[in-house]
């Protein structure tokens, strides 16, 4: 079976949840309403994609004609972990930070991605990293000036472009409305959590 995209995983999880709760799968209209699709036709396209990947079977002529083939997909902890709120002093990949696992092939990114981080805010929008995107991150501290990194400054995690100047590090936004973050390494703690290697956009979750 091919890995599910994040959006396909959401649809699959909703189907399984409805079956577990009510004994019946959702209609296309219910899927569209709960996941914010513009129409039932959009939900149908996601169902067809799941069927092509052999996660479900579509039964023709029935509004609730959906049968799950891949029972363990919703709980499968393969794929990339999505990191949520990061607690102070804890490793970024600590289990309590993992919100979900998405069926994304890590090898589609170069270098290979190790985790996903949800983007909050518009500080990097000028290079196409938008609010709500999932940022694919290769976990490494081996980064160069000019690269986009995930950095932890004291207890705050941020995505910025790196510049080193002696005992000072500048973390640059890609939006003129945001000033650089200046880190004094003599008095502040900086950890490079990883290198940005790609994005998954909400509109691409098909």
From Swiss-Prot:
It comes from the Bacteria. InterPro entries: LexA (IPR006200), LexA-like (IPR039418), LexA/Signal_pep-like_sf (IPR036286), LexA_DNA-bd_dom (IPR006199), LexA_repressor (IPR050077), Peptidase_S24_LexA (IPR006197), Peptidase_S24_S26A/B/C (IPR015927), WH-like_DNA-bd_sf (IPR036388). Its EC number is 3.4.21.88. The record marks 88-89 as: Cleavage. It holds the Pfam family LexA_DNA_bind. SUPFAM superfamilies: LexA/Signal peptidase (SSF51306), Winged helix' DNA-binding domain (SSF46785). One of its GO terms (biological process) is proteolysis. It catalyses: Hydrolysis of Ala-|-Gly bond in repressor LexA. It is an enzyme of class 3 (hydrolase). The keyword Transcription regulation applies. GO terms for molecular function: DNA binding; serine-type endopeptidase activity. Keywords: Autocatalytic cleavage, DNA damage, DNA repair, DNA replication, DNA-binding, Hydrolase, Repressor, SOS response, Transcription, Transcription regulation. Disulfide bonds: none annotated. The active site is at residues 123, 160. Residues 28-48 bind DNA. Represses a number of genes involved in the response to DNA damage (SOS response), including recA and lexA. In the presence of single-stranded DNA, RecA interacts with LexA causing an autocatalytic cleavage which disrupts the DNA-binding part of LexA, leading to derepression of the SOS regulon and eventually DNA repair. Homodimer. Belongs to the peptidase S24 family. This is LexA repressor. It comes from Vibrio parahaemolyticus serotype O3:K6 (strain RIMD 2210633).
């Amino acid at each position: 079976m091919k890995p599910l995209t994040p959006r396909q995983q959401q649809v699959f999880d909703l189907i399984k949840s409805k079956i577990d709760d009510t004994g019946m799968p959702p209609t296309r209209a219910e899927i569209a309403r709960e996941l914010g699709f513009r129409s039932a036709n959009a939900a149908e396209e996601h169902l067809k994609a799941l069927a092509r990947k052999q996660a479900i079977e579509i039964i023709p002529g029935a509004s609730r004609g959906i049968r799950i083939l891949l029972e363990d997909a919703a709980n499968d902890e393969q794929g990339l972990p999505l990191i949520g709120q990061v607690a102070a002093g804890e490793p970024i990949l600590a289990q309590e930070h993992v919100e979900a696992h998405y069926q994304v092939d890590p090898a589609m990114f170069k270098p290979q991605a190790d985790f996903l981080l949800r983007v909050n805010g518009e500080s990097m929008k000028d290079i196409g990293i938008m609010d709500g995107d999932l940022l694919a991150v290769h976990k490494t501290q081996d980064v160069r000036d000019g690269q986009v990194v995930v950095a932890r400054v004291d207890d705050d995690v941020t995505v910025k472009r790196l510049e080193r100047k002696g005992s000072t590090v500048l973390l640059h936004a890609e939006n003129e409305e945001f000033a650089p973050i200046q880190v004094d390494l003599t008095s502040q703690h900086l950890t490079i959590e990883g290198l940005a290697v790609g994005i998954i956009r909400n509109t691409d979750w098909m």
